[in-house]
Amino acid sequence: MRPEYRNKKIEAYIRELIAQAIQKIKEPEFEYLKDYIVISRVLISKDRRFADVFVSVIGNSEQRKKAVELLEKYKGYFRTFVAKNVRLYTAPELRFKEDKGIEESVRINKLLDEIMSKEDENGSDN
């Protein structure tokens, strides 16, 4: 199996495992997060020592920041959960990051809508 393909499979499996681990946490501070957090993607380093976990959170910027901080606080739990379920020499160190891809796509769509509406206004004037 080619290493790139194996890494993609590992990334997908880690993404799934972290989502499962979040649902299993019984801490009160996680209760509100469970419905508003999405693990959008995982990128593992070539040597498989690090995994960047990109998180999308529905809410304002303060809630997103708090969610990433909370996930960072519990990253030892998540790493242990991954280690028990993935057959690797060592479990990768997890680094949680806010995924701004969804936010950026919404911003770009708004800009495109503005451009289209301006073009419609200019076209109807002539």
UniProtKB/Swiss-Prot annotation:
The source's domain of life comes to Bacteria
Entry-linked InterPro entries: KH_dom-like_a/b, RbfA, RbfA_dom_sf, Ribosome-bd_factorA_CS
Which GO cellular component term is one of those annotated?
cytosol
Keyword annotations from UniProtKB, A to Z? Cytoplasm, Ribosome biogenesis
Functionally, this protein is described as follows: One of several proteins that assist in the late maturation steps of the functional core of the 30S ribosomal subunit. Associates with free 30S ribosomal subunits (but not with 30S subunits that are part of 70S ribosomes or polysomes). Required for efficient processing of 16S rRNA. May interact with the 5'-terminal helix region of 16S rRNA.
**Assembly behavior:** Monomer. Binds 30S ribosomal subunits, but not 50S ribosomal subunits or 70S ribosomes.
- Recorded protein name is Ribosome-binding factor A
